[in-house]
Swiss-Prot record:
Pfam assignment, any one: AIRC
Gene that encodes it: ADE2
UniProt source species: Cryptococcus neoformans var. neoformans serotype D (strain B-3501A)
Family indicated by similarity: In the C-terminal section; belongs to the AIR carboxylase family. Class I subfamily.
Upper taxonomic lineage: Eukaryota, Fungi, Dikarya, Basidiomycota, Agaricomycotina
Protein name per UniProt: Phosphoribosylaminoimidazole carboxylase
Biological or metabolic pathway of the protein: Purine metabolism; IMP biosynthesis via de novo pathway; 5-amino-1-(5-phospho-D-ribosyl)imidazole-4-carboxylate from 5-amino-1-(5-phospho-D-ribosyl)imidazole (carboxylase route): step 1/1
UniProt keyword list: ATP-binding, Decarboxylase, Lyase, Nucleotide-binding, Purine biosynthesis
């Protein structure tokens, strides 16, 4: 293998630190420019001989040029760099820069970025530029056009909510308060986006313009700081795929190679609006280290070095990331959260090696993976309740607790549906089987004839909501299982219900006689027990613990029968029959 090119990184924080891990595995020499000899990134990888990691500001022209002279490629772990110097370095042939300095400069100015994307057909919230030194009349005029409330945003040097200020009214008091918060910076205004979720997608782009996206994540903030990410994004109307397509479209209009973090809003009507892009690894992609086949950090290096891009697919069905934030100047709370995470199955701790803690500073993160959303919920709750600012109501919104008995789970794997409440006694045994195996489920009524739109919506959204199998009970014409099977990619198990006439044979024939290409499994009449067992076996193909549990269940059935054989042989069949009559 030919020697790898040397990569220089502007910035030596936690993102640079996490870039060093795949660099070491791939044999990629790194040089890191930042002030200090023991920054988070410099702690974890030695520089290639005879060099040392340069010590100095990553915005300094002198230091950037010195770094460029020792590297083949420069990249960034933070966008607040000197784009002019990077452009000059590349033009002079000192070093290649990725992503393109042109892209970095564009993204540094959030107004220019938004204007550029909007002109290329990327969906964004309405926005307008404010003049330099805006007056109160300027604010009132723009409020009249965009409506109130609106969001005032700094064009540059804004992150973690530090460049945003909501303007709730056009009063002098509110305007002056926003100006004081934002300081003397160029501003623009953005129409209010009453989103239902904040979403992010990581996109990797190579030098040829090929883009690949990771599964979308739901990003959950408190006080404008990212606290939790959940993936894959659950929702209706194929929202995960639509988010990926929007992110790929946006990054496709940029220049240069690397990883990009694309933030967006999911609106009440299902529309997605792009918020902003980061030209670097992003907090909303940290889960990819454990949860994906190739992490965002490795793919960034692959992209800028023209190596084959790695798969962005998830390794696991469900994953989350929890930021570890400083609670004070001491490390006590951080150590407590990290130690607690070591007791949570599927959790991986990443501490950033920062020497000083302060309130709300990002000191590390925890990734947690699971075989299902429900399992992830339980693990996530254990992590969140260990945080110093744990708030039960907030945690319950993110990771709902297990439901009360005989109530639907918030994160079900199996859906149990029936056409009428009269079918409930037949379908009830299925719930007991699923509970026995610890499989989260939901139960509801939807009729193929009386509520056809509800049935279609249920079927079409089932997979996006995280369901992996559907048990459908129906009597008489019994169209429900087949109609649901025609509207979903999930396995559907039909339960023929014995109606008042024909003893359920009509239901059986209706369900079992599906046309080719629309499979619908069918069990015996009124046998929801077997339907649930089949659902568990289906889940067991991807969840080893359930596969083992079904084996133990079958073994218990065998032992039960063998015990009866022993009693029959010991007592004789006459006494055995008398026993059965009691």
């Amino acid at each position: 293998m030919a020697p790898r090119k040397t990569v220089g990184i502007l910035g030596g924080g936690q993102l640079g630190r996490m870039l060093t891990h795949p660099a070491a595995l791939l044999g990629i020499p790194l040089l890191i420019l930042d002030s200090g000899s023991y920054t988070p990134a410099k702690q974890t990888l030695l520089p290639p001989p005879p060099h040392s990691h340069p010590d100095g500001p990553f915005t300094s022209e002198t230091h950037i040029r010195k770094l460029a002279s020792a590297c083949d490629i420069l990249t960034v772990e933070i966008e607040h760099v000197n784009a002019d110097v990077l452009e000059a370095v590349e033009k002079e042939g000192l070093c290649e820069v990725q992503p393109s300095p042109k892209t970095i400069r564009l993204i540094q100015n959030k107004y220019d970025q938004k204007k550029y994307l909007a002109e290329r057909g990327v969906a964004v919230a309405p926005f307008e530029e404010l003049p330099a030194n805006p007056t109160e009349e300027d604010f009132k005029a723009i409020a009249g056009r965009l409506g109130l409330p609106l969001m005032l945003k700094a064009k540059t040097l804004a992150y973690d909510g530090r460049g945003n200020s909501p303007l709730k009214s056009a009063s002098s008091e509110d305007i002056q308060a926003s100006l004081k918060f934002l300081g003397d910076r160029p501003l623009y205004a953005e129409g209010w986006a009453p989103f239902v979720k904040e979403v992010a997608v990581m996109v990797v782009r190579n030098k040829e313009g090929e883009v690949q996206s990771y599964d979308a994540v739901e990003t959950i903030h408190r006080e404008s700081i990212l606290r939790v990410c959940l993936t894959p994004l659950r929702g209706e109307k194929g929202v995960n795929q639509r988010a990926r397509e929007l992110a790929e479209k946006a990054v496709g209009h940029l220049e240069g190679a690397g990883i990009f973090g694309v933030e967006m809003f999911l609106m009440p009507d299902g529309e997605l609006l792009l918020n902003e892009i980061a030209p670097r690894p992003h907090n909303s992609g940290h889960h990819t280290i454990e949860a994906c086949l190739t992490s965002q950090f490795e793919n960034h290096l692959r992209a800028i070095l023209s190596l084959p891009l790695g798969s962005t697919a998830l390794r696991v069905p469900s994953a989350a990331m929890v930021n570890i934030l400083g609670a004070s100047s001491t490390m006590d709370a951080i150590d407590k959260m990290a130690d607690n995470a070591l007791t949570v199955p599927g959790a991986a701790v990443h501490l950033y090696g920062k020497a000083e803690s302060r309130k709300a500073r990002k000191m590390g993160h925890i990734t947690v993976t699971a075989e299902s959303d429900a399992e992830l919920n339980e693990r996530l709750r254990a992590l969140l309740f260990a945080q110093p600012d744990a708030h039960a109501d907030w945690i319950d919104l993110i990771a709902p607790p297990s439901p009360a008995p005989a109530h639907s789970h918030a994160k079900p794997l199996v859906g149990i549906i029936m056409g009428s409440d009269s079918d409930l006694p037949v379908m009830h045994p299925a719930t007991k089987i699923l509970e026995k195996f610890g499989v989260p489920y939901e139960l509801t009524i939807t009729s193929a004839h009386r509520t056809p739109e509800r049935m279609v919506k249920y079927a079409k959204t089932a997979a996006d909501r995280g369901l992996r199998a559907i048990i459908a009970g129906a009597g008489g014409a019994a169209h429900l299982p087949g109609m649901v099977a025609s509207e979903t990619s999930l396995p559907v198990i039909g339960v023929p219900v014995k109606a008042s006439v024909l003893d359920g044979v009509d239901s059986l024939y209706s369900i079992v006689q599906m046309p080719r290409g629309i499979p619908c499994a069918t069990v015996g009449i009124n046998n929801s027990t077997n339907a649930a067992l089949l659902a568990v076996r289906i889940l067991g193909t991807s969840v080893p613990a359930l596969n083992k549990a079904t084996e133990e269940y079958s073994k218990a059935l065998e032992e039960e029968v063998l015990a009866k054989v022993d009693i029959l042989e010991e007592e004789g069949w006459d006494k055995y029959i008398e026993r059965l009559k009691k």
